[in-house]
Amino acid sequence: MSATSVDQRPKGQGNKVSVQNGSIHQKDAVNDDDFEPYLSSQTNQNNSYPPMSDPYMPSYYAPSIGFPYSLGEAAWSTAGDQPMPYLTTYGQMSNGEHHYIPDGVFSQPGALGNTPPFLGQHGFNFFPGNADFSTWGTSGSQGQSTQNSAYSSSYGYPPSSLGRAITDGQAGFGNDTLSKVPGISSIEQGMTGLKIGGDLTAAVTKTVGTALSSSGMTSIATNNVPPVSSAAPKPTSWAAIARKPAKPQPKLKPKGNVGIGGSAVPPPPIKHNMNIGTWDEKGSVVKAPPTQPVLPPQTIIQQPQPLIQPPPLVQSQLPQQQPQPPQPQQQQGPQPQAQPHQVQSQQPQLQNRWVAPRNRGTGFNQNNGTGSENFGLGVVPVSASPSSVEVHPVLEKLKAINNYNPKDFDWNLKNGRVFIIKSYSEDDIHRSIKYSIWCSTEHGNKRLDAAYRSLNGKGPLYLLFSVNGSGHFCGVAEMKSVVDYNAYAGVWSQDKWKGKFEVKWIFVKDVPNNQLRHIRLENNDNKPVTNSRDTQEVPLEKAKQVLKIIATFKHTTSIFDDFAHYEKRQEEEEAMRRERNRNKQ
């Protein structure tokens, strides 16, 4: 479908004009008298059916501004006749046809002299009619002295934007009736190029309204082009559309400002948060209880028993270690460097409170070593490493006398009894191995003594040792004598323990609680064996399972790794004890 584009001239002109249909060759010549009917009733009919060569359908892209021109005031022509007086901009020319406003927005780049205008702006190098016309040359030199004078004056300076009437101080078209619009100053025109606002729409409406007063354009609003009032409705104006995307921006800006722009306020809290979890700004990721740095995260939860030295564990056999914690801290102060590594490796594990010295430098892979011993956190790495390479003389002697960790252990007991022993400190475990003795609380001693006497030599009485909060069992010993309630060993970390009995250590190895947690004791509210108190008896059948796991477990660490460390600490404790005794005298 294509409609013929008619070249029109005023009635006074009798010459023939060419009719173009979007093609290069000319159609039949006709007289302008033949088109009289179209001037009154169907002036805009040709707009209804755009040629198929148009790059888009004008009906889809209706111009937002009316065309304030009249067919009676000037002729339509692309052949270089008198200029067209419509105030909207010229678009790209396609085969001699005008594309008005839509082309001004959507047209493709053209050839030289046919640059598409932007948003209705006049093309400054626009050659109407033929390529001989140029705004830089005089009209006489181009062979269009009079007819193109309006174009020369109009395009020599940028006319108003967006189809507005030419304001004061600018050259007008040949028919100057539309050149000047009252109420629009040159300052207003300049503002239209700076912003798109509601007043611009109003100004355009005024301009278009003035042009529509001409006689020949009565029916233009009925065509595909929407009426002026609906062309730029206030709710859907460009200004309103531009505001919508702008609204979310302020919301995003404050957020960005908080993180970036507001460096003065946010940075301090961020820095504080980062420093909270570190110790001595060493960057150690360990977040051990801030109150007691000595309690770094432990590898395994031996038992839900809470604090380092839980008072409820009155039965813990060696509460003697409570005073020790402060001393070891002093001794081990120079060696805290190894501790951060250990703490980091054991941090992911549950209830990381205390880490055995042997596990601090190398990292305890088996969730072992955590106890209520709060003191030797940093020292162990130094002493542990040498101990692993060089065996302490005392340890060599003990290993020569005793057959630790035997492979032929008979864990399938027919007769016998098994008890859990909880110690406050691994120092006391070291002394128990060294001196082959043990001492529990007053209540614990009575219970163990009664059990030992009840067996009457018919079966062994095994003790399963574990340090509070260590997360592992550290070994198994057999009770070898009744309790001597009046004896005082004088070797424990605390001097308050009274009584002793002999033991023989069979297994000295770290067995993580996760290896035994599945075994539950029916005589202890069905709690796991790892969640037991001092001198808690283990039923024989469950005891067999525990002994089998401990005997067959392939350990990688044991208290023997820290034997030299505990030897040194014992010497320091004895020196301090002698000093106190001298002061008392």
From Swiss-Prot:
Organism: Mus musculus (Mouse)
Compartments, as annotated in UniProt: Cytoplasm, Cytosol; Cytoplasm, P-body; Cytoplasm, Stress granule
Residue numbers carrying N-acetylserine: S2
Residue sites binding RNA per the record: K422, S423, Y424, D428, W438, C439, N468, W492, W497
GO CC annotations, alphabetized: cytoplasm; cytoplasmic stress granule; cytosol; P-body
Domain notes for this protein: The disordered regions have the ability to interact with each other and to 'phase separate' into liquid droplets within the cytosol following binding to mRNAs containing multiple m6A-modified residues. This leads to the partition of m6A-containing mRNAs into membraneless compartments, where mRNAs may be stored, degraded or used to transport mRNAs to dendritic arbors in neurons.
Function according to Swiss-Prot or TrEMBL: Specifically recognizes and binds N6-methyladenosine (m6A)-containing RNAs, and regulates their stability. M6A is a modification present at internal sites of mRNAs and some non-coding RNAs and plays a role in mRNA stability and processing. Acts as a regulator of mRNA stability by promoting degradation of m6A-containing mRNAs via interaction with the CCR4-NOT complex or PAN3. The YTHDF paralogs (YTHDF1, YTHDF2 and YTHDF3) share m6A-containing mRNAs targets and act redundantly to mediate mRNA degradation and cellular differentiation.
Compositionally biased tracts (Polar residues): 15-24
Pfam families with a match to the protein in the record: YTH
The name this protein goes by in its record: YTH domain-containing family protein 3
